[in-house]
Amino acid sequence: MDYILRILPNMFAGLGVSAQIFLITIVLSLPIGILLALVRISKVAVFRKLAEIYIYVMRGTPLMLQIMFIYYGLPLMLNVQISDFLAAILAFVANYAAYFAEIFRGGIQSIPKGQYEGAKVLGFTYRQTMWHIVLPQVVKRVIPPLGNETITLLKDTSLVYILAMNDLMRVTRAFVQRDFDTMPFLVAAVFYLVCTAILTKILTYVEKRYAVYEE
C-alpha cells in the first residue's frame, strides 16, 4: 500500500496528460467529422472522392503508424519541428475525425428523403435543412456508435507512449522497469476502468436524455 501511495502522484500526472489528449481530440474531431461526412455525401464528385480517399487511408492504416509518421515523417518532409504533444493531437484528430465522419454519414443517409423534400417545399435551403432538421435527428441516432468510438479513444491514448510523452502508460512502464514490480500495471488498469465507467455513465445519461426528448 505504501508503494501505491508513493507512485499515485506520478500516475495522476500521467492520467492528466492522457485526459488532455482525449478531450482535445473529442472537441476537434467531432465537428471535423461532421464536415467530412457532409463532403462525403456532397454532389461535387471531386470533393466526395477526396473525402472518401482520406477516410479510407485514415481507417485503413494503424493509428500508431500515423502518430509516428506525423512526429518523424512530417518534420523531414516539411523541414519543421513538431512537438510530441502536437504530433499526438494531429494524429488522433485526423484518425478519429475519419471514424466519426463515417458514423455521421450513416446517420445522415438514414434520414428519409421525404424530409428533405418537405423542407424544400417549406422554403428551407440545403444548409437550413441540414442544421435544423437533419442533424438534430442524426445526433440522436449516432450516440451509441459515437460512444463506442469515444471509449476506444480513451484506451488508444496509451499509444502516445511511443513519443516518450509522460502519459499514464509511459509513467506506468517507467515504474515497472525501475522497480521490477507489476503493481503499477494493476494501478493503471484501475485508472482506465474507472475512467471508462465514468464515460459510460455519461454516455448512457446523454442517450437517455435524447430518448426522453424523442418521446
What does each of the following model-derived ranges do?
Residues 1-215:
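Transmembrane alpha-helices and adjacent helix-loop boundaries
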